[in-house]
Amino acid sequence: MVSGLGSRGNPFYGRDVLSILDFSRSDLEYLFAEADRVRRDPSAFSGELRGYVLATAFFEPSTRTRLSFQAAMLRLGGSCIDLGELEKSSIAKGENFADTVRMLDAYADVIVVRHRLEGAARFAAEVAEKPVINAGDGKRHHPTQAMLDLYSVKTLKGSVDGLVYGVLGDLKYGRAAASFILGLSLFKPRKVYLISPGLLKAREDVKEALRERGVGFEEVESPSEVIGELDVLYVTRIQRERFPDPSEYEKVRGSYVVDSKLLRNAKEGLIVLHPLPRVDEISFDVDGTPHAKYFEQARLGIPLRMALLKLVLKG
């Protein structure tokens, strides 16, 4: 539908969720307040979306995003349908993406799409009459992950503003990292360190978003250079599946690891976040430290997505 502004005093009602930059800071704060209400009394929301149907169409692998959307819908009293394995769907018979979206649009009240091609979710929104939520397309956009990550910072640190952030990992191909950085540009971080091997530096459009909004940032290659300054360390895996050349991946494979040795030099209150799945970029010896907040971050995905679905569908 490629929706305009929300209504009913709710900036999300009836809207597509395609990019974190489609929303303002005040929009996100409205969402976070609703997520707080869900966390305080989830049972009060148990029948909010009874009679509504969510469709998930994932053209790339997913665990947390797909299951958390489905769990959120079920906890709200709604129902879920899933496109399932692509080789068992009509896509295997040659059905095009637009026709698949049209069918889901006929069956459901909201469509959650993940696709390897950037722009696929926006195209789906142009085809569909119902709201479309982008669960990740290409290497740039993953808006609900960014919403969750910002909400996690707000919940765990009290505010998104005034903190020093380190975003570590694959900043070239990783859409979760890119969306988080774009999301930070809507707030007032004290500083953002973009930490990556030289081959995986953040793309220019992401850095330009920080410049346009007056967010100070610096590019460094090793977390050890800045670990003592950070309030939040956001770690991502190297996106092996997005490398056009396997030899390029081999050059950077295993080039950074967050372990307990690195964290000895961290602030006492540093939190370590990760959108998951992790591979080998966070050592298991970090899990037992007070810095490790990535599993708590993942758990916050349920109330955040419950709040989002409720606001998009019902207000």
Swiss-Prot record:
Q: Please state the Enzyme Commission number of this protein.
A: 2.1.3.2
Q: Which PROSITE patterns match?
A: CARBAMOYLTRANSFERASE
What InterPro entries does the record tag this protein with?
Asp/Orn_carbamoyltranf_P-bd, Asp/Orn_carbamoylTrfase, Asp/Orn_carbamoylTrfase_sf, Asp_carbamoyltransf, Asp_carbamoyltransf_Asp/Orn-bd
Task: Give the pathway annotation.
Answer: Pyrimidine metabolism; UMP biosynthesis via de novo pathway; (S)-dihydroorotate from bicarbonate: step 2/3
* Family from the record: Belongs to the aspartate/ornithine carbamoyltransferase superfamily. ATCase family.
What is the recorded function of this protein according to its Swiss-Prot or TrEMBL entry? Catalyzes the condensation of carbamoyl phosphate and aspartate to form carbamoyl aspartate and inorganic phosphate, the committed step in the de novo pyrimidine nucleotide biosynthesis pathway.
What name does this protein carry? Answer: Aspartate carbamoyltransferase catalytic subunit
Say which species the protein is native to. Answer: Thermofilum pendens (strain DSM 2475 / Hrk 5)
Gene symbol of the encoding locus:
pyrB
